[in-house]
Swiss-Prot record:
Is required not only for elongation of protein synthesis but also for the initiation of all mRNA translation through initiator tRNA(fMet) aminoacylation. Its EC number is 6.1.1.10. The lineage of its organism: Bacteria, Pseudomonadati, Pseudomonadota, Betaproteobacteria, Burkholderiales. This is Methionine--tRNA ligase. Pfam families: Anticodon_1, tRNA-synt_1g, tRNA_bind.
């Protein structure tokens, strides 16, 4: 829906009442909600409230994602059963969502009978359709804990840079990716034991089946975000490429989750039953409230289904989930909306700097949750762009927009109306041109919200607030009040101001629902909907005494928030020390810390900022790939011959073979680290490093992308 679709106030009323099911990604049940999570839940909640204000039948569904090895191991560490842990975390998560006004119709758990039944039925339907395969695979196995180990539960020495204590899938020092079998001196993070290789039968969803590929090629054409469509097409490849791989949907005991029907000791991988949890939570609500569940989720249903997610889990929601639904006889998502990541003050959230901010610490510090809702909304749009919470800008924007512009309007007019006119507006003032302008703008503001262009909606709203304040400044009600002869003009000014304030409150209601409730009580009106733009204040209903709606952000509150989250880091560290660790892990941690000290100093820890002098040590150069070939005997490496403007070319080995054919790269410009010490490899000498991007979780969002400068750059140019 675009602004042109809504050209009048009347257009804000629904032409037909839609049935809409909306979800946000499920938070994992082994940690606290932080402000990075809240971006998504606030984004979704604003959209849901917008649709409800149109009068549609909307259900916003959520749940905790409870299964998997991390939950099982954390519960063991805390001396709890997994059930006890997830029940406690559910209470904490529900508290945090309530604090920030996230209006779930049902917030449930994936560890439920409804989810078990639905997961089993979907699995059995896929099996009936010939889309489940059994295969023997070899995995790392902890002989002490008698369990198979996920990649992130294995550590060892990086096979590339030889940094100690690195995860089984990637090195945090040099950034290399590799297989767990390539780690040197590996050990289990659970027990400290050396893993052994063990074969096990696993179950796979046959995503490579031509039926799945054909369906997904058609389904992707309906995605609203071009970035998502492009990424999907990249994963699918061209017709005939057969790029889709089958998906391992099983895990071996011990595992906290649902056992696979007919497969004792085998459990559904958490990513199979987690999205089914959307339906399970909705089923729980339907059973309580007498809603026809099947009418909403069966194939061919006219109900709409939307998923809001982070861009890091696009892979699961646009490949596996739609295909699972399609071939198990369910409706597929109407659309999937992905958002970007959150940074704080331009950097990754950091515990050492206090910017890894938990939802509860924000509330405990006394900060208004609607301040954060407003700030995030002012940054959000319909793309997958990352957004930044700049704490200075947060303070300035809240104080300027919400207090200085918006709330100030009511405080300047309400007292005069109550004192001089018995709290009753002048009915003729409801036809004032300024009021008409605001009334007409509501339709386009509502359309911006529905199009997920929240920043546009708020920009338009604040531009209107500026006009209202200019009107008040020009009319000067405080001067008019000095002379009884100006009573009519004073009455009009106050009435226009308060009706404008009502319309601005309507425009802000999806973002600041609690302020809207207070405004509704102040005016003595029913909950505002979009159609109420055409229902102005009336002299028949006097306003109530004005109560202050919002305070300014105090810089001391921001300081306290950062301090509280730095304190939480210290508390976590103290708790970890008190809880203790295995002797094997403690010894390895101490040894690896010493071994990695130089590497960390050179590369920088995630949370430690580097100086400009440190950055200046890295010599980044534009390089032209003049030749490229596969490396015989390596599944990952390409050999690049690079021209960086020197007398001789450079030879570089790069682990990008999975993403590029050699002929694709010849002639391209890229960026390389030119002053990296040469490294002797078994295939030859590597004289630098080319830069490439990848997702933090390459399993969830696979892909490598070399950096390419804009046209005009030439080999040898410095990047600075």
């Amino acid at each position: 829906m675009s602004a042109s679709d809504l050209t009048s106030v009347q257009a804000t009323a629904p032409q037909g009442r839609r049935q809409i099911l909306v979800t946000s990604a499920l938070p994992y049940a082994n940690g606290q909600i932080h402000i990075g999570h809240l971006v998504e839940y606030i984004q979704t909640d604003i959209w849901v409230r917008t649709l409800r204000m149109h009068g549609h039948e909307v259900y916003y569904i959520g749940a905790d994602d409870t299964h998997g090895t991390p939950v099982m191991l954390r519960a063991e560490k805390e001396g709890l059963t997994p059930k006890q842990l997830i029940d406690r975390v559910w209470t904490e998560h529900k508290r945090d969502f309530d604090s920030f006004g996230v209006s779930f119709d049902n917030f449930y758990s994936t560890d439920s009978d409804e989810n078990r039944v639905l997961s089993e039925s979907i699995y059995l339907a896929l099996k009936e359709n010939g889309l489940i395969a059994e295969r023997a695979i070899e995995q790392a196995y902890d002989p002490v804990k008698e369990m198979f180990l996920p990649d992130r539960f294995i550590k060892g020495e990086c096979p590339k840079c030889h940094a100690k204590d690195q995860y089984g899938d990637n090195c945090e020092v040099c950034g290399s990716t590799y297989l767990p079998t390539e780690l040197l001196n590996p050990y289990s993070v659970v027990s400290g034991a050396t893993p052994v290789r063990k074969t096990s039968t696993h179950y796979f969803f046959r995503l490579s089946d031509p039926r799945c590929e054909s369906f997904l090629r058609e389904w992707v054409s309906g995605l609203a975000q071009p970035e998502a469509t492009n990424k999907m097409r990249e994963w699918l490849g061209d017709a005939g490429e057969a790029k889709l791989a089958d998906w391992d949907i099983s895990r071996d005991a011990p595992y906290f989750g649902f056992e696979i029907p007919g497969a004792p000791g085998k459990y559904f991988y958490v990513w199979l039953d987690a999205p089914v949890g959307y339906y399970a939570s909705f089923k729980n609500l339907c059973d309580r409230e007498g809603i026809d569940f099947d009418a909403w989720i069966r194939a061919g249903s006219t109900a709409e289904q939307y998923h809001f997610i982070g861009k890091d889990i696009l892979y699961f929601h646009t490949l596996f989930w739609p295909a699972m639904l399609e071939f198990s006889g369910h409706r597929t998502p109407t659309n999937v909306f992905a958002h970007g990541f959150l940074t704080v003050d331009g950097a990754k959230m950091s515990k050492s700097r206090g910017t890894f901010i938990t939802a509860q610490s924000y509330i405990d510090t006394g900060l208004n949750p609607e301040w954060l809702r407003y700030y995030f909304a002012a940054k959000l749009n319909a793309t997958m762009e990352d957004i930044d919470l700049n704490l200075d800008d947060f303070q300035a924007r809240v104080n300027s927009d919400l207090v200085g512009k918006y709330v100030n309007i009511a405080s300047r007019a309400a007292g005069f109306l109550i004192k001089r006119f018995d709290g009753r507006v002048q009915d003729s003032a409801m036809n004032h041109p300024l009021v008409a302008k605001l009334r007409d703008a509501i339709a386009s503001i509502a359309a911006h919200y529905e199009g997920r262009e929240y920043s546009r909606a708020l920009r338009q709203t604040m531009e209107l607030a500026d006009e209202v304040n200019a009107y008040v400044d020009g009319a000067k009600p405080w001067e008019l009040a000095k002379d009884p002869a100006n009573a009519v003009a004073l009455h009009e000014t106050c009435s226009v101001s308060l009706e404008a304030f009502r319309l601005l409150s309507l425009a802000l209601k999806p973002v600041m629902p609690r302020v809207a409730e207070a405004v509704e009580a102040f005016f003595g009106v029913a909950p505002l909907a979009w159609a109420d733009a055409a229902k102005p204040l009336s002299s028949a209903q006097p306003i109530k005494a004005y109560q202050h709606l919002m305070t300014r952000v105090d810089p001391k509150q921001i300081d306290a928030l950062l301090a509280a989250n730095r304190d939480s880091l210290q508390a976590d560290a103290a708790g970890a020390a008190a809880a203790g660790t295995t002797a094997a892990n403690a010894a390895k941690d101490a040894k690896s810390a010493k071994a990695n000290a130089k590497a960390v100093a050179a590369n920088g820890a995630d949370d430690a900022p580097i100086s400009i002098d440190d950055f200046a040590k890295v010599d980044l150069r534009i390089a032209k790939i003049v030749a490229c070939q596969a490396v015989e005997g390596s599944d990952k490496l390409l050999q690049l011959t690079l021209d960086i403007g020197e007398e001789k070319t450079r030879n570089v080995f790069s682990g990008i073979k999975s993403a590029y054919q050699p002929e694709q790269l010849v002639g391209k410009l890229t960026v390389m680290v030119a002053n990296l010490a040469p490294r002797k490899m078994k295939f030859g000498l590597s004289e630098g490093m080319v830069l490439a991007a990848s997702a933090a979780d390459e399993k969830a969002e696979p892909g490598l992308y070399i950096l390419e400068p804009h046209s005009g750059a030439k080999p040898g140019m410095r990047v600075k």
